[in-house]
Amino acid sequence: FLAKKVAKTVAKQAAKQGAKYVANKHME
């Protein structure tokens, strides 16, 4: 359903944000 698609998109966005956060922390 649409909700599942939205959840997948949100998860993808969260993963991208998480990766960016980890990268920034690693840079410090």
UniProtKB/Swiss-Prot annotation:
Gene Ontology molecular-function annotations? toxin activity
Instruction: Provide the free-text tissue specificity comment from this protein's UniProt record.
Output: Expressed by the venom gland.
Q: Pfam families in the record, alphabetically?
A: Cu (PF17563)
Q: Which GO terms describe its biological process?
A: defense response to bacterium
Q: Which family does it belong to?
A: Belongs to the cationic peptide 04 (cupiennin) family. 01 subfamily.
Does the keyword field hold Nucleotide-binding?
no
Q: What is this protein called?
A: Short cationic peptide-1b
- Protein's cellular compartments: Secreted
Give the taxonomic lineage as stored in the record. Eukaryota, Metazoa, Ecdysozoa, Arthropoda, Chelicerata
- Keywords assigned by UniProt? Amidation, Secreted, Toxin
Q: List-wise, which residues carry Glutamic acid 1-amide?
A: E28
What's any one GO cellular component for it? extracellular region
* Major localization class: secreted
Q: Which InterPro entries match?
A: Cupiennin
